[in-house]
């Protein structure tokens, strides 16, 4: 999901999950891509999503344009929930799954490395091509107690927890504060990627994962 906070109004380009009524909405599917566009209170948000050929990554290019006559200060928040590599097990084996989640944050890149140290040679990552103003990797910190995806605490308050998940439900969210003059447009590339590392190259130092494959992939896409 991508959340937009414009003043006191929170909305999504694709309507869900907040379900704020939009002034306009469109969804277009082409050959290998989808463009979702929403408009609310003079702000247009467009999400171009595609999987580039030959890489294990999904790209979401988010464009914000101020169509009003006044400057706007908005907050763009991304969100993905990481799986634990087995969809069936994710939904059933809670007594184990809630103890294994592990992440690492480096700049604007959030690495999901659950079980990488113990028995896996692959990890996932979620990145954006701009410095971030905050992040979260722990679901409860992001949503807030008893909240759902329609009203995440971090989005509605505009304050991320900069949480580092240790077990429970690992996820990734970036907060980007954007100032737009009338008519100005800004574009951001979010990349959700997956890499596999040869067993002998898993670590570059004790307990330090090999991030080189992820960084090489990001150089191509951002």
Where do the protein language model's features map onto the residues?
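Anionic coordination/interaction segments
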Residues: 1-222
């Amino acid at each position: 999901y991508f959340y937009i906070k414009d003043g006191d109004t929170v909305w999504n380009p694709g309507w869900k999950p907040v379900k704020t009524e939009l002034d306009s909405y469109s969804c277009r599917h082409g050959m290998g891509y989808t463009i979702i566009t929403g408009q609310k209170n003079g702000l247009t948000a467009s999400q171009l999503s595609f999987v580039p050929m030959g890489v294990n990554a999904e790209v979401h290019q988010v464009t914000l344009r101020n169509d009003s006559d006044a400057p706007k200060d908005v907050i763009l928040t991304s969100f993905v929930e990481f799986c634990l590599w087995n969809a069936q097990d994710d939904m059933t084996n809670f007594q184990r799954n809630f103890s294994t989640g592990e992440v690492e944050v480096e700049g604007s890149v959030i690495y999901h490395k659950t079980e990488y140290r113990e028995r896996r040679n692959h990890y996932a990552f979620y990145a954006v091509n701009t410095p971030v103003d905050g992040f979260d990797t722990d679901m409860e910190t992001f949503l807030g107690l008893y909240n759902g995806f329609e009203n995440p605490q971090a989005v509605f308050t505009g304050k991320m927890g900069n949480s580092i998940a240790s077990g429970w439900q690992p996820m990734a969210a970036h907060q980007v504060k954007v100032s737009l003059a009338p008519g100005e447009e800004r574009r951001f590339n979010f990349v959700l990627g997956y890499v596999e590392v040869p067993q002998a190259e898993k670590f570059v130092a004790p307990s330090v994962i090999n991030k080189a494959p992820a960084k090489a992939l990001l150089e191509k896409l951002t």
